[in-house]
């Protein structure tokens, strides 16, 4: 509409986090109730509120509830958060951490367990249910999982209810290994542990996976028809996802798509005109979109940029389909691709660093006759690992660069099939061995403390955690902490030029990972974007880029951690920027180090 307006339809609701319009009525999931709202007299307002089902609440702030999703028999599916008491806790009220089914008569029955913060739940055109998950305890990074009856999605706390009548499983908390190995290792021992269909690498593909919708009509262009769009609350953006089934199991790849929404993007819905509506909030959690709430819509412009449209797993690597024919001279060069694989730890701790990272050599490259498909034959495709695929140097035939140069493929299964016959493909090139500088051994990145900084040698003298031996004492001691919402608790610090500074950074009042980086005046955006471009390798550098704009920094600190650094204040007076360069944080988390004479 050229003149959009709001109209009150229903009131007195308790934290509605899900709506669905079905057969003439709105169904709302409140914190503790599934409510059917009907306008019986046609005046534009609900006049009949029907309690379809309700459930226990303890009163913990984290007991969010989501849905409903309808199946063909009018059953409704809901997902429940675990409570948060410093860790995810399901035992405070029944069925927390579960997906449940509500029949048309209101009967509630459990379906699947292991959920932590399942903000999005949807059923695709094939009738399969997926849910979105947020990083936290037992969840190394954001992810999307296909749920079926009896599945355990990973959060062990929910298993406290597995012995209840109606439970489709008998798995116990004590059955779940808690040894920080990758999740697929635990799945070898816990047979109903469901691996994610697609991992969303934390910070690189958002920080708070929220909702997902399927584009069955090609609303965002014909190349993306049948794919999915996923929202992220913390990074205020939409990402794109392609799924395929290998050996009966979903897997696929996620790509960046559209950033810059005005607030935290929580809900997605298609409009009648094919536009994508986004419902937004930043209540309680910060977001890169600075508004507290909002409603926006996105329309396809009618033009498709040069992108990776699809990536398919092959028996010996991956095949990339581009939206436009490639320039063969760039697509045939192995140096124009970076392929890395990595994983996350599965444990009760909050989140996970990247582990078992490996750079892959390209053995051969095959280009289709129409120049739209490029097949990469790798030294190894690692089953159960996330593969970062970056054809960053490939151009379209018209010279156009990729709008988004990275995708993250979750390889749950390697498809069977014949390996490529290079001799029969006129556009096949056997790739030469990469130069020594491009050969990387598998580098475990299990800490983000001192060892990571030592690898980042250009920055090593910018990160001193012991007082220099020639100092008798610091001239000034500074302390800066964090507050919820991706903010430092101090926005300005003042020091004299050339003074000896002891600075302690306390990451004690937020539940996110942060660092503290002091940079040249006016360069916070530049340094923040450089940190983001490091990709998966950034975690071993604490997301501090090798830049002469970086003056001093801490390493990445997990929640409840502190670090002290020592430095001499710049000799030139000015307002030096303090910024967190953890991807997605640099636009919000800032301060000023004011240097005076």
Task: Give, region by region, the residue ranges found by the protein language model.
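N-terminal edge beta-strand
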Residues: 302-303, 471-501, 509
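Extracellular/periplasmic metallocenter environments
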Residues: 454-465, 548-597
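Beta-propeller domains with acidic blade repeats across secreted/periplasmic ectodomains
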Residues: 1-305, 310-314
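Acidic, Ser/Thr/Gly/Pro-rich low-complexity segments and short DxT(G/T)-type signature motifs
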Residues: 302-307, 327, 391-455
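Short, surface-exposed alpha-helix to beta-strand junction/turn motifs within ectodomains of secreted
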Residues: 323-364, 389-395, 405-409, 518
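Surface beta-strand/loop "capping" patches
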Residues: 301-328, 486, 494-497
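Extracytoplasmic beta-sandwich strand-turn segments characteristic of Greek-key/jelly-roll folds
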Residues: 352-369, 523-571
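Beta-strand cores of secreted/periplasmic/IMS beta-sandwich domains, seen most often
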Residues: 1, 491-518, 563-577, 593-595
């Amino acid at each position: 509409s050229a003149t959009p307006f709001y109209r009150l339809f229903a009131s007195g609701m308790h934290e509605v986090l899900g709506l669905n319009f079905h057969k003439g009525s709105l169904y709302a999931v409140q914190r503790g109730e599934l409510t059917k709202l009907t306008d019986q007299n046609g005046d534009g307002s609900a006049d009949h509120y029907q309690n379809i089902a309700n459930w226990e609440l303890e009163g913990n702030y984290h007991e969010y509830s989501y849905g409903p999703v309808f199946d063909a028999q009018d059953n409704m599916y809901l997902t429940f958060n675990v409570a948060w008491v410093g860790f995810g806790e399901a035992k405070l009220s029944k069925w927390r951490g579960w997906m449940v089914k509500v029949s048309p008569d209101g009967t509630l029955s459990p379906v699947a367990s292991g959920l932590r913060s399942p903000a999005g739940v949807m059923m695709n055109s094939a009738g399969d249910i997926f849910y979105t998950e947020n990083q936290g305890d037992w969840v190394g990074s954001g992810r999307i999982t296909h749920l079926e009856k009896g599945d355990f999605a990973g959060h062990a706390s929910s298993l406290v209810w597995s012995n209840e009548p109606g439970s489709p499983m008998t798995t116990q908390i004590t059955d779940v290994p808690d040894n920080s190995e990758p999740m697929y290792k635990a799945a070898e021992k816990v047979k109903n542990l469901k691996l994610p269909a697609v991992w969303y690498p934390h910070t690189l593909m958002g920080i708070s996976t929220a909702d997902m919708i399927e584009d069955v009509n090609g609303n965002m262009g014909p190349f993306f028809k049948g794919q999915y769009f996923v929202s992220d609350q913390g990074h205020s953006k939409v990402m794109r996802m392609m799924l395929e089934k290998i050996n009966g199991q979903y897997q696929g790849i996620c790509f960046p798509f559209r950033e810059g929404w005005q607030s935290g993007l929580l809900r997605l819905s298609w409009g009648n005109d094919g536009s994508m509506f986004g419902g937004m909030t930043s209540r309680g959690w910060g977001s890169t979109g600075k508004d507290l709430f909002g409603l926006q819509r996105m329309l396809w412009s009618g033009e498709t940029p040069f992108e990776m449209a699809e990536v398919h797993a092959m028996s010996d690597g991956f095949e990339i389909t581009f939206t436009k024919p490639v320039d063969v001279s760039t697509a045939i060069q192995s140096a124009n691709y970076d392929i890395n694989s990595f994983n996350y730890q599965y444990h009760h701790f909050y989140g996970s660093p990247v582990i078992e990272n490996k750079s892959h050599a390209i053995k051969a490259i095959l280009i289709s006759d129409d120049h739209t498909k490029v097949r990469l034959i790798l030294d190894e495709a690692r089953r159960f690992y996330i593969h970062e695929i970056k054809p960053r140097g490939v151009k379209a035939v018209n010279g156009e660069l990729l709008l988004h140069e990275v995708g993250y493929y979750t390889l749950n299964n390697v498809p069977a099939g014949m390996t490529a016959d290079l001799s029969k493909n006129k556009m096949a090139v056997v790739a030469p061995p990469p130069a020594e500088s491009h050969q990387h051994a598998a580098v475990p990145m299990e800490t983000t403390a001192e060892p990571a900084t030592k690898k980042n040698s250009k920055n090593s003298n910018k990160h001193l955690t012991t007082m220099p031996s020639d100092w008798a004492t610091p001239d000034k001691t500074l302390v800066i902490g964090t507050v919820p919402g991706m903010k430092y608790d101090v926005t300005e610090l003042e020091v004299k030029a050339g003074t000896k500074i002891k600075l302690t950074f306390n990451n004690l009042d937020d539940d996110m990972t942060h660092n503290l980086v002091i940079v040249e005046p006016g360069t916070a955006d530049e340094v923040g974007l450089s940190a983001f471009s490091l990709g998966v390798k950034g975690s071993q550098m604490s997301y501090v880029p090798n830049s002469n704009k970086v003056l001093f920094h801490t390493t990445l600190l997990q929640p409840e951690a502190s670090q002290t650094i020592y430095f001499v204040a710049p000799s030139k007076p000015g307002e030096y920027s303090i910024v967190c360069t953890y991807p997605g944080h640099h636009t919000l988390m800032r301060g000023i180090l004011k240097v005076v004479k």
